[in-house]
Amino acid sequence: MSGIILTFCAFGLGALAVFALPPFSMPVLLPVAFGALYLLTVGESRMRAGLAGWAFGVGFFLFGLSWIAESFFVDAERFGWMAVPAVAGLAAGLALFPAAAMAAFAWSRTKGVSGALIFAVCWSVSEWLRGTMLTGFPWNLIAYAWADYDVPRQTAAWVGSYGLGLVTVLLSVLPVTLLMRNRRHNTFAAFV
C-alpha cells in the first residue's frame, strides 16, 4: 500500500473512531477503526506505522476536538481567523502520541494475540502520557466511548479510564488477530 493511501485510510479511521465517543456514543465502531489500524500497522516499518498512527491521530483529534474552534468566535472579527490553524495545529501535535504508539508497536514485531496485547498497551501508554505530560490533555480518551453505557462504565472504578481504554482497544483488535490466524480470512478481516 502506498504511503498516500495508508495516510488517507488511517486519517479516515481516526475520524470514524470519533463517532464512538459522546455525543454520538457508537462504540461498535471501535473494532472497525482499531482493527483496521492494526491491519495497517502490523508488519510495517516503524516509519510507516508511525505515519499511520499520526494520520489516525490527526483524524481523531481534528474531528474530536473541533469544538475548541467555538472559543475563537466569541470575538470573531479579532480571533476567528485563528480557529482553523489552532485546531489543526493541536490535532497535529496531539497526533504525535498515537504516532509514537504505532511506531513502538511496529518495533515490537509481534503478531497474533500477543500483537493485539502489545498494540493495546502501546495505545494506552500513549493516552496516559498525553494525559500526564506537561500540563496533560486527557480529552478524547477511548474509555469515554462507554460514558453512556452503565455496565462497561462501572469497570472504570476498578481499572480507571486508562485501564478501560486498554481493555476496549484489546477487545477491538482481538477479532482481527484471530481472523488473521487463517491466511484465507485476511481479506475478510480487512472489512471487520
Where are these regions (language model features)?
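Membrane-embedded alpha-helical bundles of multi-pass enzymes
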Residues: 1-192
